């Protein structure tokens, strides 16, 4: 009987803990300038959003749940300019293996000088400069 109670308690804790975690959002914004197109390619483990294009002032959101493993790591390759000559690679999300980050919003904004990163209410910070 005590084993049954222990099993039910462990099962309840597992399901309640996992259900409370909200999705994490990676927001990608194109603020390069009028008539400038941003190309991005984001991937994580077996998830691959493919090559996507974003017009000026466009916004895309990638939503996912952190499973607490390295498979939750998201990397994005950005390209812009004539013939997509300028590029940079960004680690958009790195999981905290001890404490999953639930409901966070990570914003990546493409500007002419660099990709800027913003989290929560903090001001945007330059993350990676464009390379050619």
Swiss-Prot record:
TM stretches of this protein: none
Protein name as annotated: S-protein homolog 15
Q: Name one GO cellular component term.
A: extracellular region
Q: Where in the cell is it found?
A: Secreted
Report the main location listed first in the record. secreted
Answer whether the UniProt record assigns the keyword Secreted to this protein: yes
The record, for InterPro entries, names: Self-incomp_S1
**Signal peptide location in the record?**
1-20
Which one Pfam family would you cite for this protein? Self-incomp_S1
Q: Which gene is this protein's source?
A: SPH15
The organism is Arabidopsis thaliana (Mouse-ear cress)
Q: Name one GO biological process term.
A: rejection of self pollen
Q: Which domain of life is it from?
A: Eukaryota
Q: Which UniProt keywords apply?
A: Secreted, Self-incompatibility, Signal
Q: Which family does it belong to?
A: Belongs to the plant self-incompatibility (S1) protein family.
